[in-house]
């Protein structure tokens, strides 16, 4: 009997812990909230425990550290600290694939994304579908670019496109998951760009040409290594497939360089696995 009592106590205790640990994905999304923590410029946690991915802006990453990441986080902290924020959701659902709320953040009549764009602490980043009038966001970004504020003073943001992420190592065996290799490329210019004739080159000089695809300002395209049907409707996540039967990118170290149709370098990004210090 003494062995049963702890078990009867333990089961509801474990259930309580499991419920507490589960992501709050089924509750209705809050319209207003207090922010309990800021991870980086575009990611924060609400007092409810919900994590929020900010709409309309992509800020430099804290890990691995990117230039102006700390300044972006500090700007977001100062904007939301001690204040009730309003959350603006889009037409495509309230949560992303990571379970985070996807929302704009307002304090009174001030939009956090515009606040960051104006200071050059991020670039326009549209998560489709999104029917927002982007004019004020583009204007804020262009004022920061013209003044060379923040990221616009760095070499990484001098082209029309910016590689925001580089997944050179697919999950599992790359040979069986070729499309698990991909880059995400954002149009950081104020105008739509036709990518026909652009190409991407790996560290060994192998070249892959982009198909015709119009990339609106602030939108991203996922560039997969393998075969598939191109997704060219900007109301959804844009995607192109380079058509390779085998993995393109080296898991240990590689470099992706994008050239425009005239052979000018638009952007480049390196992937490398850092060795642990003994």
Question: Which residues make up each language-model segment?
Answer:
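Positively charged n-region of N-terminal signal peptides that target proteins for export
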Residues: 1-9
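Small beta-barrel nucleic-acid-binding modules, primarily SNase/OB-fold domains
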Residues: 2, 20-278
């Amino acid at each position: 009997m003494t062995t049963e009592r702890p078990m009867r106590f333990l089961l509801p205790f474990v259930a309580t812990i499991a419920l507490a640990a589960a992501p709050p994905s089924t509750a209705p999304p809050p319209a207003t909230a207090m922010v309990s923590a800021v991870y980086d410029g575009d990611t924060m946690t609400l007092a409810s425990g919900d994590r929020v991915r900010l709409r309309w802006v992509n800020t430099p990453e804290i890990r691995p550290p990117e230039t102006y990441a700390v300044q972006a986080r500090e700007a977001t902290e100062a904007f939301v600290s001690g204040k009730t924020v309003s959350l603006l959701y889009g037409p495509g659902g309230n949560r992303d694939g990571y379970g985070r709320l996807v929302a704009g953040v307002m304090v009174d009549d001030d939009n956090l994304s515009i606040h960051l764009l104006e200071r050059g602490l991020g670039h326009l980043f549209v998560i489709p579908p999104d029917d927002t009038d982007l004019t004020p966001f583009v204007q804020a970004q262009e004022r920061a670019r013209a003044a060379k504020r923040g990221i616009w003073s760095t070499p990484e943001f001098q082209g029309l496109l910016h590689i925001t992420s580089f997944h050179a190592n697919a999950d599992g065996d790359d040979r069986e998951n070729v499309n698990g290799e991909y880059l995400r490329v954002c149009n950081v210019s104020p105008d739509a760009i036709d990518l026909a004739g652009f190409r991407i080159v790996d560290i060994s000089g192998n070249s892959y040409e982009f198909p015709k695809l119009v990339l609106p300002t602030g939108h991203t395209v996922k560039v997969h290594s393998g075969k598939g049907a191109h997704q060219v409707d900007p109301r959804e996540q844009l995607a192109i497939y380079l058509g390779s039967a085998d993995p393109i990118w080296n898991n240990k170290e590689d470099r992706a360089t994008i050239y425009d149709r005239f052979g000018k370098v638009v952007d480049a990004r390196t992937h490398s696995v850092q060795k642990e210090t003994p």
